[in-house]
Every structure is written in C-alpha cells, then in structure tokens.
C-alpha cells in the first residue's frame, strides 16, 4: 500500500474514487462510498475532492427527496440545480438546500421559476402525476418550465425504484421528456433508462437506454398536456415490453447456451455438501 501511495497522487486517487461513486448502482451509493472511504483512508480528501461526484450521482439518478412540511417528493436533477447546493421544487414553488451525502433537504424558501409558463407547467405536471400514479407503484415526477436558447420549453422527469438489498437486487427507472411550446406542432424528445443490479451468488447488471422522438400538436395547455402524456405512455409501454421480451429471449437462448450441461450421471453436484461425497472425503483425508 505504501508503494501505491508513493506512485499515485492525491488528485489521481480522488479521480478514481469519484469514478467509482458516480457509477454506483441504484440504491447502493452508501455501500460504494464506504468501500471507497476505506480504500482512500482520507476523509477530508474524499469529501473535498469528490463532492462533485456526490452531486453528479444524485442528479444523474433523479434522486427523490422529501422536504419537511410538504407532501410531494421532488427529484434532484440538473434542471432544478440553482447552484450552491440549492434546488428548485417547481410544484411547491420553493427552493431548498440539499445535502448530497446525507440526501436530506433543508432551508426551504419561496421561489418562482416557471419563466412565465405557469399554466403550461401546471397542466403538464397534473397530467404527468396522474400517469405516474397509475403506472408506477413507487414513482415520482417533477416538471420544469424554462426558456432555453429563446425557446419556451417543458421538461418532465420521471423516477421509480425498487430497492431490495435483503433479496440482493436493486433497480431504478428514469425517463426525461422535453418539448418546446411552438404551435402548431412541436418535437418531443425523450430518453428512457433502466438500471438493475443483481448480486446474489454473482454480479449481474442490466443497463439499458432508449432515445425517443415524436411530434406533438400544440394547442391549449390542457389538450397539449393530454397528448404529451399519451406520447410518454405509448413510448414507455413499448420500451418496457421490448425489454421484457428481449430478456426472455436471452434467457431461452443466450443464457441457456452458457449453462454447463449435466454430467453423465444426470445428477447435479451439491457443492455446499461436497464433503459428504466420496471425493470430498478423499480430499479431506489427503
């Protein structure tokens, strides 16, 4: 370890640590952080040098957070980043301080940031909330209204996760949808992401994403929001169905081809009871 410390600079150590952290599977940030902390063995260096990695991880993962005094959770995303660790909750019209390590919100303050698009944002938010409630058992969403390069833009973010560490798996769904308010038609751009980690007696990850483009008729706020959600629903249903079908095909073909055939005896070896077999006893005596 001494030779390693001599050869690798603190800057390089932090870069490696940050890489591990930003690639932590969903629901396993704390485990990865604690392992990296032990390897680096320098808390001050880790906290100061890798702080950007904590923030990047939470924004990339659309981490949901509950703000005390408010019912709905809000997503931590780059679209709500106000700087200095403050984030926007457009639904509740507040900003708040977010601790990227503890994943806790504090100091809520009034904040108006809909770019004069209040009715558009609220219509899309209301429709998206209903959709997420119907389709995701543990889903959250946040809708932003911003002016980007002179274009009035609606951005919708969806997150849903299932963390089952006792059963050795964790998974997260993320999707992001955008359209500009440019009558009579607008282009809808979406990106869908799935990440699942299974680690019982092995280490398997499913990482998948899909880019989507569609067109949207822009009329009044309510009707446009309805059509926007319909596009989201169709694309996400199609993607999830394709993932399921592809996974089944892989299970029936690719994974099956990797399995070791049964021995001539047509009997599987119970490796947990190997000592009870004759070969096990012979090895033990040897």
Swiss-Prot record:
<feature type="modified residue" description="N-acetylalanine">
    <location>
        <position position="2"/>
    </location>
</feature>
<dbReference type="GO" id="GO:0015629">
    <property type="term" value="C:actin cytoskeleton"/>
</dbReference>
<keyword id="KW-0597">Phosphoprotein</keyword>
<feature type="modified residue" description="N6-acetyllysine">
    <location>
        <position position="19"/>
    </location>
</feature>
<dbReference type="GO" id="GO:0005829">
    <property type="term" value="C:cytosol"/>
</dbReference>
<comment type="similarity">
    <text>Belongs to the F-actin-capping protein alpha subunit family.</text>
</comment>
<comment type="subunit">
    <text>Component of the F-actin capping complex, composed of a heterodimer of an alpha and a beta subunit. Subunit of dynactin, a multiprotein complex part of a tripartite complex with dynein and a adapter, such as BICDL1, BICD2 or HOOK3. The dynactin complex is built around ACTR1A/ACTB filament and consists of an actin-related filament composed of a shoulder domain, a pointed end and a barbed end. Its length is defined by its flexible shoulder domain. The soulder is composed of 2 DCTN1 subunits, 4 DCTN2 and 2 DCTN3.</text>
</comment>
<keyword id="KW-0963">Cytoplasm</keyword>
<dbReference type="GO" id="GO:0003779">
    <property type="term" value="F:actin binding"/>
</dbReference>
<dbReference type="Pfam" id="PF01267">
    <property type="entry name" value="F-actin_cap_A"/>
</dbReference>
<dbReference type="GO" id="GO:0065003">
    <property type="term" value="P:protein-containing complex assembly"/>
</dbReference>
<dbReference type="InterPro" id="IPR002189">
    <property type="entry name" value="CapZ_alpha"/>
</dbReference>
<dbReference type="GO" id="GO:0071203">
    <property type="term" value="C:WASH complex"/>
</dbReference>
<keyword id="KW-0206">Cytoskeleton</keyword>
<dbReference type="GO" id="GO:0051016">
    <property type="term" value="P:barbed-end actin filament capping"/>
</dbReference>
<keyword id="KW-0009">Actin-binding</keyword>
<protein>
    <recommendedName>
        <fullName>F-actin-capping protein subunit alpha-1</fullName>
    </recommendedName>
</protein>
<dbReference type="InterPro" id="IPR042489">
    <property type="entry name" value="CapZ_alpha_1"/>
</dbReference>
<dbReference type="GO" id="GO:0034329">
    <property type="term" value="P:cell junction assembly"/>
</dbReference>
<keyword id="KW-0007">Acetylation</keyword>
<dbReference type="InterPro" id="IPR017865">
    <property type="entry name" value="F-actin_cap_asu_CS"/>
</dbReference>
<dbReference type="GO" id="GO:0051015">
    <property type="term" value="F:actin filament binding"/>
</dbReference>
<comment type="function">
    <text>F-actin-capping proteins bind in a Ca(2+)-independent manner to the fast growing ends of actin filaments (barbed end) thereby blocking the exchange of subunits at these ends. Unlike other capping proteins (such as gelsolin and severin), these proteins do not sever actin filaments. May play a role in the formation of epithelial cell junctions. Forms, with CAPZB, the barbed end of the fast growing ends of actin filaments in the dynactin complex and stabilizes dynactin structure.</text>
</comment>
<dbReference type="GO" id="GO:0045296">
    <property type="term" value="F:cadherin binding"/>
</dbReference>
<keyword id="KW-0117">Actin capping</keyword>
<dbReference type="GO" id="GO:0008290">
    <property type="term" value="C:F-actin capping protein complex"/>
</dbReference>
<dbReference type="GO" id="GO:0030863">
    <property type="term" value="C:cortical cytoskeleton"/>
</dbReference>
<feature type="modified residue" description="Phosphoserine">
    <location>
        <position position="9"/>
    </location>
</feature>
<dbReference type="GO" id="GO:0005856">
    <property type="term" value="C:cytoskeleton"/>
</dbReference>
<dbReference type="GO" id="GO:0005576">
    <property type="term" value="C:extracellular region"/>
</dbReference>
<feature type="modified residue" description="N6-acetyllysine">
    <location>
        <position position="97"/>
    </location>
</feature>
<dbReference type="InterPro" id="IPR037282">
    <property type="entry name" value="CapZ_alpha/beta"/>
</dbReference>
<dbReference type="GO" id="GO:0030036">
    <property type="term" value="P:actin cytoskeleton organization"/>
</dbReference>
<dbReference type="GO" id="GO:0070062">
    <property type="term" value="C:extracellular exosome"/>
</dbReference>
<dbReference type="InterPro" id="IPR042276">
    <property type="entry name" value="CapZ_alpha/beta_2"/>
</dbReference>
């Amino acid at each position: 370890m001494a030779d390693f410390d001599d050869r690798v600079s603190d800057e390089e150590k932090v870069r490696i640590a940050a890489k591990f952290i930003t690639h932590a599977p969903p629901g396993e940030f704390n485990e990865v952080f604690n392992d990296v902390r032990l390897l680096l063995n320098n808390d001050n260096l880790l906290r100061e040098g890798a702080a950007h990695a904590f923030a990047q991880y939470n924004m990339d993962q659309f981490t949901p957070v509950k703000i005390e005094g408010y019912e709905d959770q809000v997503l931590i995303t780059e679209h709500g980043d106000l700087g200095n660790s403050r984030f926007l909750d457009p639904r509740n019209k507040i900003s708040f301080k977010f601790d990227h390590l503890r994943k806790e919100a504090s100091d809520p303050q009034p904040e108006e940031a809909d770019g004069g698009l209040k009715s558009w944002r609220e219509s899309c938010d209301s429709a998206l909330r209903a959709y997420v409630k119907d389709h995701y058992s543990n889903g959250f969403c946040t809708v932003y209204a911003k002016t980007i390069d002179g274009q009035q833009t609606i951005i919708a973010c969806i997150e849903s996760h299932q963390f089952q560490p006792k059963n050795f798996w964790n998974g997260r769904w993320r999707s992001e949808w955008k359209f500009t308010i440019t009558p009579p038609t607008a282009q809808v751009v979406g990106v869908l992401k799935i990440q699942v980690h299974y680690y019982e007696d092995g280490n398997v990850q499913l990482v998948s994403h899909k880019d989507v483009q569609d067109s949207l008729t822009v009329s009044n706020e309510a009707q446009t929001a309805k059509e926007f959600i319909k596009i989201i629903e169709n694309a996400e249903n199609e993607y999830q169905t394709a993932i399921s079908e592809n996974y089944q095909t892989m299970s029936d073909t690719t994974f099956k081809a990797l399995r070791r055939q049964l021995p001539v005896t047509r009997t599987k070896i119970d490796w947990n009871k190997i000592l009870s077999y004759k070969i096990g006893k012979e090895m033990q005596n040897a």
